[in-house]
């Protein structure tokens, strides 16, 4: 996906806040976090969730990002929450333009 310039130039704390905000708005429950800033550029942010995890990786030099959303459905169906998170991140990262998003999902 192609990110907005604002996101592509963001530091780890900004991206962590973005991920925390969208995860909570989607109704998922964060329990731990990790960030890494790479040299000369690039940022990864991961939130561990009660439901599994979500990761955001930004390649600032290419103005690109990947998002990995994983949810478990052991105690309840979290698929709708994962879909909502994808929509919220699309809005935040690409101003809602999901044309460059590529989806891979396993259900069952």
Could you describe each region identified by the protein language model?
Residues 1-108:
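Polybasic/polar functional segments that serve as interface/processing modules
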């Amino acid at each position: 996906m192609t990110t907005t310039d604002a996101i592509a130039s963001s530091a780890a704390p900004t991206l962590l806040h973005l991920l925390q905000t969208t995860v909570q708005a989607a109704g998922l429950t964060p329990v731990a976090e990790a960030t890494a800033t790479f040299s000369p550029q690039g940022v990864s942010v991961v939130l561990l969730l009660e439901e599994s995890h979500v990761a955001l990786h930004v390649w600032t030099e290419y103005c690109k990002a990947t998002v990995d959303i994983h949810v478990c459905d052991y105690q309840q169906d979290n698929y709708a929450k994962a879909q909502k998170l994808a929509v919220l991140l699309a809005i935040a990262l690409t101003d809602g333009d999901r044309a460059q998003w590529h989806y891979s999902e396993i259900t069952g």
